[in-house]
């Protein structure tokens, strides 16, 4: 086993992605990796009490111990409710007359 772990810390905004690679000692937690990366000073809008964190798309608590080659991800809160966004997409496709949008209409009104 190596003396250090290679870990990446990732935070993505719509127009900018931050990916920082670190060498950290074994037994390091998710919170320690985020602090060591400096991503909190680079992006002061990150609030770890509101933003969820994870490793490779799986939600993890801040005290989770990391393994070698883990990618720590900081997730932004959702801007739009997923159910509402889907309803808007269906309405838009109905208005545009696409086959996908019309499949939800009764057969006699197609």
From Swiss-Prot:
User: What protein does this entry describe?
Assistant: Protein RnfH
Give one Pfam family: Ub-RnfH
Comp. bias (Basic and acidic residues): 88-110
- PANTHER family xrefs: UPF0125 PROTEIN RATB
Taxonomy, superkingdom:
Bacteria
What is the protein's species of origin?
A: Paraburkholderia phymatum (strain DSM 17167 / CIP 108236 / LMG 21445 / STM815)
Specify where the region named Disordered lies, as residue ranges: 86-110
**Alphabetical list of NCBIfam families matching this protein:** PRK01777.1
User: Which protein family is it in?
Assistant: Belongs to the UPF0125 (RnfH) family.
Gene encoding this chain? rnfH
